[in-house]
Amino acid sequence: MTQVTVGENEGIESALRRFKRQVSKAGIFADLKRLRHHETPVEKYKRKLQQRRRRR
């Protein structure tokens, strides 16, 4: 779960930017996209390949 605490002197815009960055790093949107639609075997293979590359 991604969580961002807003500091006392911090603006909402910067906190929102930090939140978006954390969400994209965690790959939450990619997971949602994957779960929303049917995934063909070729797409599954490509996704796993990307995950392997990302881990390196």
UniProtKB/Swiss-Prot annotation:
A GO CC term attached to the entry = ribonucleoprotein complex
Which top-level group of life is the source organism from? Bacteria
PROSITE patterns according to UniProt: RIBOSOMAL_S21 (PS01181)
What the entry lists under InterPro entries is as follows: Ribosomal_bS21, Ribosomal_bS21_CS, Ribosomal_bS21_sf
Tell me the name of the encoding gene.
rpsU
The answer to whether keyword Ribosomal protein applies is: yes
Quote one Gene Ontology molecular function term.
Answer: structural constituent of ribosome
Family of this protein = Belongs to the bacterial ribosomal protein bS21 family.
Q: Which organism is it from?
A: Synechococcus sp. (strain RCC307)
Protein name as catalogued: Small ribosomal subunit protein bS21
Q: Which UniProt keywords apply?
A: Ribonucleoprotein, Ribosomal protein
Family annotation (NCBIfam families)? S21p
